[in-house]
Amino acid sequence: MDLFEYQAKELFAKHNVPTTPGRVTTTAEDAKAIAEEIGKPVMIKAQVKVGGRGKAGGVKYAATPDDALTHAQNILGLDIKGHIVKKILVAEASDIAEEYYISFLLDRANRTYLAMCSVEGGVEIEVTAEENPDALAKVPVDAVKGVDLALAREIAEKGKLPAEVLDSAAVTIQKLWEVFVGEDATLVEVNPLVRTPDNQILALDGKVTLDGNADFRQPGHAEFEDKDATDPLELKAKEHDLNYVKLDGQVGIIGNGAGLVMSTLDVVAYAGENHNGVKPANFLDIGGGASAEVMAAGLDVILGDSQVKSVFVNVFGGITACDAVANGIVGALKTLGNTASKPLVVRLDGNKVEEGRAILAEFNHPLVIQAETMDAGADKAAALAAASN
């Protein structure tokens, strides 16, 4: 999960990384009030998860609260590379003597952590890496040993930071490592890390990417989720602990096991070529749980997508037998009632398949159509979706 700058700075403050005071807001009037509270010139900064804010007019210096009001009015609603600005950060402006760059990231290619540091900060680091690669130091970090003050100083030194700021920069670099490890991040980046005229080291900007696989031990990270940018159906699925990804097709997919669901997507897409080009509408893996509650939640999410014209349930019974899946489908349709209005093609195979098929046959719901094979089920679901368009 990528964070907004203001969220990254909240984590910086938690780990005592020095930065400038400020607050986030959604209105220009509040931006003026925050500037008045700060009592000094401020920066008005668009909060979007994309680079190039400054060039797009999303970062402005405001000498007075009235300037803050004007800039906030201009920035809110601005389109920056397809991202509409809904929030702005009002932060105290800082005098800058020099700008540096520092980041920690997961180096997947070499299966280690990596620190990157440069005396040339404040510009796109990709440009520096391409045009002047010697200016960007890359220092591997041992996952067990981590970053102590000595290594932090070495990172700063290899980044060619001035000798007079090495010690103070090392302290901040070590604290940024604490953010990286303590918050289960895959990226912590500060660009620029600045030196003020009185030799303070401040993180003026911040970019943090959190590892969603660590959410179970980071409950506080839930508050960082950008619900405005997340598809409402995906949010609804997440509330029920369903592994769901919305796609752009017309055939809803439910399966058990990521591999089977991925195969189902392919088979439905292939079948759709013969039926007006219909495509899968989603990825939904119910895992090993096919209870009535889980199935009802899954169907409720899929049927909430107005693009869905049919649903294909493709389940291979293993530990969760097909009779349990069939009972789950029956219970789900009873729970949903009239909400379930799209045809449901069901293909069961594996453990207790005959019992499962018998349960669905006895239920005899007008929307349920059974299929013997995955290919037949995909073709039927695609045909039904095409006929409804």
Swiss-Prot record:
GO terms for biological process: succinyl-CoA metabolic process; tricarboxylic acid cycle. It is an enzyme of class 6 (ligase). Binds 1 Mg(2+) ion per subunit. ATP binds at K45, G52, R53, G54, S94, E99. It holds the Pfam family ATP-grasp_2. Residues 9-236 form the ATP-grasp domain. PROSITE patterns: ATP_GRASP, SUCCINYL_COA_LIG_3. Transmembrane segments: none annotated. GO terms for cellular component: cytosol; succinate-CoA ligase complex. Disulfide bonds: none annotated. Substrate binds at N256, G318, I319, T320. It catalyses: succinate + ATP + CoA = succinyl-CoA + ADP + phosphate; GTP + succinate + CoA = succinyl-CoA + GDP + phosphate. Its cofactor is Mg(2+). Its EC number is 6.2.1.5. GO terms for molecular function: ATP binding; magnesium ion binding; succinate-CoA ligase (ADP-forming) activity; succinate-CoA ligase (GDP-forming) activity. PANTHER family: SUCCINATE--COA LIGASE [GDP-FORMING] SUBUNIT BETA, MITOCHONDRIAL, SUCCINYL-COA SYNTHETASE BETA CHAIN. Succinyl-CoA synthetase functions in the citric acid cycle (TCA), coupling the hydrolysis of succinyl-CoA to the synthesis of either ATP or GTP and thus represents the only step of substrate-level phosphorylation in the TCA. The beta subunit provides nucleotide specificity of the enzyme and binds the substrate succinate, while the binding sites for coenzyme A and phosphate are found in the alpha subunit. Belongs to the succinate/malate CoA ligase beta subunit family. This is Succinate--CoA ligase [ADP-forming] subunit beta. The lineage of its organism: Bacteria, Bacillati, Actinomycetota, Actinomycetes, Mycobacteriales. The gene is sucC.
